[in-house]
């Protein structure tokens, strides 16, 4: 390790409710050598804060696994705020859009791979790997896509340029090494992964950060100084005595290894063509020969080709069926101890289980019909057994853990039931389905009169649409939350619910992240007695938890019979509520509804509407002040790497500037 720092948790809050007990128990389990445990934390008990305390107390490098990019981004923002002096990294798929290569034999349809990569996320991935290779105080927040193949830590750590002040090294040698590391020479604007030469100065923008550039000053063949500079102002950020520069991208293949890989690909191609000819599959033989030879020509000339990942087994010199390298190997490199946090484990683990089989099924068809060599099957995610073998100390975090996590942890379950706010799990009522709509409207009117909101969950899209339309023809203002909405569009609807523009939101899947709304005092579950995933005991407990942010929280289930799933959910909620009540009585705590700020809507056309609304009300003197405020917010969002939010602030500024100009011209 080049840099040793301790994890330092910075927060205005101290553990409260059940948090301290849970933190102590988890830390004690880790210190006693217990490899796996479950944090069974009720909704709203501050599980992320407890996990952050465990990281600070154990001082272990940590990987936090989330089941999607949105949740990963939320966790990344929270942990970055709590650990401002440590490295908190974001490691998700760098594709903004991805259509995998596929073949459908029934219709003889070949679907070519199509993708759009995100350069910013690609840089963040490389930053993650670099941090893991050089520091000990690293927290990585990743999506489940991190089980896909990555670069070998052995190869990555080999590829570097190490320089120190006073070192004797030829100018040409530095240039040669930079090119070997994948850096491209540019004479003008530097972007990540490029360098330029100006007299005795070499300026490099690393592949893993755009926050600084490295300026190397040479005096003949001697390194005179190494400065980290601001890429825009050129001001010196820090003077370094030594610096290690890592490669410009995840995968860099040197010429000698490339030559061996190409020879091995040719040998595999010969064997595959013989196989197809032997089985009288002439079309497949011609197809695999033509496609592979085209790829090889491109690799020889440019060092890559479209779909180069299908040749990674050869390019990395791995054996057939060998477990691929992943981000996990950077944590365990040099036999280091580390910590894995599986967030929402009841969703994340099933995803991990399914990814390998889905990937293999698609590629197997490509191999059988001559679109890919069999070695393409080795460019894959970890299977579930490999995933479990990679793990070190693990905490499965969930309000409703599956039997899988409980078995893996050998029943080492840490409970976190009491909320720091003293809020209780909601009261549950069961009502018959007869006249359920009339009953719902009566309940919604009661909530509306108290300035409270509601979530309504139904089983079908048709029911959701019909119910929303019906409610909107009454005195109730309703919105329909469906899965085709983008993340930011969903947050606009939730914000409008919080502001009282809507009285309720109707949806099918109310288990997703971002639905913790303190104004919601009523949750209504239609068809509670119907079988299916959305009415399982665990799903019901998650839905019930949506009413646990409000002191008046209540859940009404519409059902004609009480199913086993319903009874289990009711019993568990009752058990938790009794524990919470007892704690509150003992400590004289009065439950209070959470006060949570409502952020500005910055999605879709809302920024334009907000700008025009502001312009209609603003005086000329206020324009500049408002734009100044928005620019500050944009810069703050960019610093937190909330780039989507920053972009929306930028659009709002542009809109205000345009309106300001049009007002001036009138």
From Swiss-Prot:
<feature type="short sequence motif" description="Beta-hairpin">
    <location>
        <begin position="94"/>
        <end position="117"/>
    </location>
</feature>
<keyword id="KW-0963">Cytoplasm</keyword>
<dbReference type="GO" id="GO:0006289">
    <property type="term" value="P:nucleotide-excision repair"/>
</dbReference>
<dbReference type="GO" id="GO:0005737">
    <property type="term" value="C:cytoplasm"/>
</dbReference>
<keyword id="KW-0228">DNA excision</keyword>
<dbReference type="InterPro" id="IPR041471">
    <property type="entry name" value="UvrB_inter"/>
</dbReference>
<dbReference type="Pfam" id="PF00271">
    <property type="entry name" value="Helicase_C"/>
</dbReference>
<dbReference type="GO" id="GO:0003677">
    <property type="term" value="F:DNA binding"/>
</dbReference>
<keyword id="KW-0378">Hydrolase</keyword>
<feature type="domain" description="Helicase C-terminal">
    <location>
        <begin position="436"/>
        <end position="598"/>
    </location>
</feature>
<dbReference type="GO" id="GO:0009432">
    <property type="term" value="P:SOS response"/>
</dbReference>
<dbReference type="InterPro" id="IPR004807">
    <property type="entry name" value="UvrB"/>
</dbReference>
<dbReference type="Pfam" id="PF17757">
    <property type="entry name" value="UvrB_inter"/>
</dbReference>
<dbReference type="Pfam" id="PF02151">
    <property type="entry name" value="UVR"/>
</dbReference>
<keyword id="KW-0067">ATP-binding</keyword>
<dbReference type="InterPro" id="IPR014001">
    <property type="entry name" value="Helicase_ATP-bd"/>
</dbReference>
<feature type="binding site">
    <location>
        <begin position="41"/>
        <end position="48"/>
    </location>
    <ligand>
        <name>ATP</name>
    </ligand>
</feature>
<dbReference type="Pfam" id="PF04851">
    <property type="entry name" value="ResIII"/>
</dbReference>
<dbReference type="InterPro" id="IPR006935">
    <property type="entry name" value="Helicase/UvrB_N"/>
</dbReference>
<dbReference type="InterPro" id="IPR001650">
    <property type="entry name" value="Helicase_C-like"/>
</dbReference>
<dbReference type="InterPro" id="IPR024759">
    <property type="entry name" value="UvrB_YAD/RRR_dom"/>
</dbReference>
<protein>
    <recommendedName>
        <fullName>UvrABC system protein B</fullName>
    </recommendedName>
</protein>
<dbReference type="GO" id="GO:0004386">
    <property type="term" value="F:helicase activity"/>
</dbReference>
<keyword id="KW-0227">DNA damage</keyword>
<dbReference type="InterPro" id="IPR027417">
    <property type="entry name" value="P-loop_NTPase"/>
</dbReference>
<keyword id="KW-0347">Helicase</keyword>
<comment type="similarity">
    <text>Belongs to the UvrB family.</text>
</comment>
<keyword id="KW-0234">DNA repair</keyword>
<keyword id="KW-0742">SOS response</keyword>
<comment type="function">
    <text>The UvrABC repair system catalyzes the recognition and processing of DNA lesions. A damage recognition complex composed of 2 UvrA and 2 UvrB subunits scans DNA for abnormalities. Upon binding of the UvrA(2)B(2) complex to a putative damaged site, the DNA wraps around one UvrB monomer. DNA wrap is dependent on ATP binding by UvrB and probably causes local melting of the DNA helix, facilitating insertion of UvrB beta-hairpin between the DNA strands. Then UvrB probes one DNA strand for the presence of a lesion.</text>
</comment>
<keyword id="KW-0547">Nucleotide-binding</keyword>
<dbReference type="GO" id="GO:0005524">
    <property type="term" value="F:ATP binding"/>
</dbReference>
<comment type="subunit">
    <text>Forms a heterotetramer with UvrA during the search for lesions. Interacts with UvrC in an incision complex.</text>
</comment>
<feature type="domain" description="Helicase ATP-binding">
    <location>
        <begin position="28"/>
        <end position="171"/>
    </location>
</feature>
<dbReference type="GO" id="GO:0009380">
    <property type="term" value="C:excinuclease repair complex"/>
</dbReference>
<dbReference type="Pfam" id="PF12344">
    <property type="entry name" value="UvrB"/>
</dbReference>
<dbReference type="GO" id="GO:0009381">
    <property type="term" value="F:excinuclease ABC activity"/>
</dbReference>
<dbReference type="InterPro" id="IPR001943">
    <property type="entry name" value="UVR_dom"/>
</dbReference>
<dbReference type="GO" id="GO:0016887">
    <property type="term" value="F:ATP hydrolysis activity"/>
</dbReference>
<dbReference type="InterPro" id="IPR036876">
    <property type="entry name" value="UVR_dom_sf"/>
</dbReference>
<feature type="domain" description="UVR">
    <location>
        <begin position="624"/>
        <end position="659"/>
    </location>
</feature>
<keyword id="KW-0267">Excision nuclease</keyword>
